[in-house]
Amino acid sequence: MLNLLILILFIVFSSPIVAAEIFVSNTEKNCPEWSQDKLQRETNSLMQQMAHWDQLYRQKGISEIDDEVYDQLMSELTHWQFCLKQAPHSDFPVEVFPDNKLVHPVAHTGLSKLKDKQEINRWLHGRLPVWLQPKIDGVAVTLVYQNGKLVSLISRGNGAEGVNWTAKSRYIPDIPQNIENAPPDLVLQGELFLHKEEHRQQLLGSDGARNRVAGLMMRKDHSSELKQIGLFIWSWPDGPAEMESKLRKLADMGFPLALRYSHKIEEPEQVQKLRMHYFEQPMLFATDGIVLKQEIEPKGNQWRSGSNSWAVAWKHPLRHQVTQVREVNFTIGRTGKISVVLGLDKVKLDDRQISRVNIGSVRRWRQLDVLPGDRVTLTLAGHGIPKLAQVVWRIKERQDIQPPDKQHYHALSCLTLTVGCEQQFNARLKWLGENLQMTGVSSGSWAMLTERKLVTDLTGWLALSAQQIAALPGIGDKRAQAIYSQFSKAKNQPFSYWMKGIGVPYMDKLSDNVYHWQQLEQKLAAAQLKQQLTVGQLKKLSDFVSDAQIKAIAEKLSVAGITGFDRENGVVVNPADMAQ
């Protein structure tokens, strides 16, 4: 299986961009803060996982992981090997398959990857006009023709030599075996890709296309599925100097796609427009970006692997971004619900910097089995909210992390500030402030008040003075006065706002019928809310209202003179009113 992984490393990473990417990523990234022994164990574990995926691709054509995710994990693996000072993987295939390799007549150079529009514009400066082509997501190859006859089909490999795939070429209709009007010695470089119908990269990603091609080409048998493979020629070393002439000649020789999908760029604005075109519109192949190239290229004998100044790539926005889980945090909401939030290595997704993601309940966290050190993929859900898509690799050495005891947190817990109640109590204050329509009183404001023990129950803020608030670190007189003003205004808010704010259930259904605390108690005692609430809802409401802590809150609000809680002006409810 390890040998299979080595071969896949050799072939699947035949994309011309990879060599440059690996060098840059390894020199820019920091090595993991692990011991060498642990780093070696985790590296071996990741290699085994990659080998498993490759085995499925080769033997069954099953894609368990998207190509762009595979690439990111392979980059991580290569980086760890770099940290371990291990030999580059590109040397391995020659040792493993010495009898099945061929030297490229012209080296595959690879491409530098530019990150954004600003870098693209800098590269374009002084070079326009240039040409743009889609960066086909497939397997790079060299085709060698002598006197019009195909004599070699070679995988990119390490750029200097690759695997001999000539025998497979006869089963791929898009590869001409003979060309009548070819020059005596013809060397072409291009991409084997999987034919698609109406493929939208933005929606579907690469859909395992590249690995599917690699799997078909590596099989010992000649599968009928080889006819699904297409060929896009993206380079003709030592061909016609003018691109338009080169493209027409390629089409005449049986390679029409380059002519159809090449665009002359005279203004920088065209680049972004075409990049999004290939990302969003239906195509007959998967793409992972666009390639820009100058019209004038060096002679083929000057091409070197990892060295290319006349062409660059700009990849598509990632649909799935791989990142490392740094920590697992448990948040407790005002009702006692425990949620799990993962702290992440910061990543950029659709121009957003993401460093945390909410994955929901403790139960789902256990199902996902995600811990610090694991690699996860992120996507953006509706309204740009980050979403965990998948745990793609789990670290071998697992931490033992225990969530808070759910028995301690519920609808009536943490109504006062006690040890272990900080999160839920602050969430209750935030909810109360929002329902009382306080502006400028943030979660941070409440946290400062509770940290200094100025507020230890849901009504404690009613008695605060502006001077007490101003004494908090970093508040200042102006902000303290603004907060105090909001507290003062809140005292005059309607009864229904207060009821919802302190957490009384189902107030949306009762606000038209209940306008005083004593009235609610009396209606519950007389079972006069059956028309508005179900049996279960009535029990939940009754349990809440009859709780000693809630009664204490109502009493404090009464003392503070809050409308609807004041007992001096309490109402006497007659039977007719109770029946409403």
Swiss-Prot record:
Protein name from the UniProt record: DNA ligase B
Catalytic site: 135
Catalytic activity entry: NAD(+) + (deoxyribonucleotide)n-3'-hydroxyl + 5'-phospho-(deoxyribonucleotide)m = (deoxyribonucleotide)n+m + AMP + beta-nicotinamide D-nucleotide
UniProt-listed Pfam families: DNA_ligase_aden, DNA_ligase_OB
EC number annotated for this UniProt entry: 6.5.1.2
PANTHER family per record: DNA LIGASE, DNA LIGASE B
Family per record: Belongs to the NAD-dependent DNA ligase family. LigB subfamily.
Keyword match Glycoprotein: no
Record keywords: DNA damage, DNA repair, DNA replication, Ligase, NAD
Function of the protein: Catalyzes the formation of phosphodiester linkages between 5'-phosphoryl and 3'-hydroxyl groups in double-stranded DNA using NAD as a coenzyme and as the energy source for the reaction.
Gene name in the database record: ligB
Molecular function per GO: DNA ligase (NAD+) activity
Listed SMART domains: LIGANc (SM00532)
Keyword DNA repair: yes
BP-aspect Gene Ontology terms: DNA repair; DNA replication
